[in-house]
A protein has these predicted regions:
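Short, well-structured N-terminal submotif of metal-dependent ribonuclease cores
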Residues: 1-36, 40-52, 58
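Active-site neighborhoods of divalent-metal-dependent phosphate/nucleic-acid chemistry enzymes
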Residues: 12, 18, 59-93
Length: 93
């Protein structure tokens, strides 16, 4: 199962990625609520369709606040330029 980051989806929406399309057809792509939320905040063509399709993909788990802070401490993730969303995605895979 592959978690696709927001930037990869945005690139795909601008120029279809045949590898991503193939992986989607093979049911190898999953999503995360924070990726859907980031995309929902942007300017998407066919916004409702995109969000609906993302919701139908298998979902990666969401970390609690304490789980995220434990992950950051355990792997010394501070000061590396990661956003909280990046850390959540790392912790969900």
């Amino acid at each position: 199962m592959i978690l696709v980051d927001t930037s990869v989806w945005i690139d795909h929406f601008h120029h279809s990625d045949p590898v991503l399309v193939s992986l989607l057809h093979e049911d190898e792509i999953g999503s995360h609520p924070l990726v859907a939320e980031e995309l929902a905040m942007g300017s998407l063509r066919a916004r409702d369709d995109v969000l609906r399709h993302l919701a139908h993909l298998r979902q990666f788990p969401v970390l609690s606040h304490d789980e995220l802070l434990t992950l950051v401490a355990a792997h010394a993730l501070w000061g590396r330029g990661l956003s909280p969303v990046d850390a959540h995605l790392l912790g969900s895979v």
